[in-house]
Amino acid sequence: MAPRIAVVGAGTMGAGFVRLFADAGYRIRVFDVRPRAAAAAAEQREGAVAAASLTEALAGADLCIEAIVEELEPKQALFRELANVAPAGCVLATNTSALSVAAIASAVPEAVRPRVLGTHFFNPPDIIPAVEVVRGPETGDEAVETALGLLRRAGKVAAVLTDSPGFVANRIQLAMVAEAWRCLEDGVATAESIDAIVSGSFGFRLFAYGPFAIGDFNGLDVYEAVLRSLASAYGERFSPPRALLEKVGRGELGVKTGKGAFDYTPEEVVELIRRRDEIFERLAEIKKTL
């Protein structure tokens, strides 16, 4: 039997969830306090149904994903309602970008809190692969495994995180955004130039690799030296992190030493570099068409 998904909130993200899970063959019920919005979201895919109430939306659901306004009090109020109507075993997920999962879960009875977690998708959620599965302090293993299974079966790249401000993506992304604005304020470059440099340099690499893999290619000792130089100019926000200093102190500098953030055999290094260059050449050709 196909999994049942309840989507609460039929805005941009909720409508994307309908497309995502319907395309995976799941049964979808979507509810919104605006009936027309729920109907419009459901009409995107055959088999999706606009529910007339929360009770109807959650009937038999394996997973409920909330996608309402990004404010704590409305989310807490909704989760109190969800806790009253959700079937036993239904995982209650909040699609928050930065709010505390623990704070949202605090609104429901203690017996329900093990079923509450975060699922931070990225817009458009039916296209962008990653989902941050955020485990609150009271989230149970079963809820995490259920969410991971349903998300991965739908083709998502789902990773488990602890409940921390900004999670991973926004903590890193917004640090970059803030620094880009500082470059603009300081007169270093125009907005157009900054975007061109980012999208054509480390942004280009980030399509295929995360910051740790890129760091291992570039050399962690190089990162340390550059960070020290930047810290002398811009202050403590660029100070090398302790974990990076410890790696460099042990001579674990990345691909060139066979160990950095990750471990590498000599054979793996050869294949990694070959594969990296192949990917970048293909990306460069695609970028020319944009």
Regions found by a protein language model. Give the residues of each.
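C-terminal regulatory/interaction module of P-loop NTP-utilizing enzymes
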Residues: 182-190
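NAD(P)+-binding Rossmann beta1-loop-alpha1 motif at the extreme N-terminus of oxidoreductases
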Residues: 1-47
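Structural/interface elements that position substrates and couple domains in central-metabolism enzymes
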Residues: 35-38, 173, 177
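NAD(P)-dependent Rossmann-like dehydrogenase/reductase catalytic/cofactor-binding core
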Residues: 3, 24-26, 153-156, 162, ...
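Structural motif
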Residues: 8, 31, 51, 67, ...
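Rossmann-fold dinucleotide-binding core
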Residues: 91-163, 170-171
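Rossmann-like NAD(P)-binding element
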Residues: 33-36, 47-92, 99
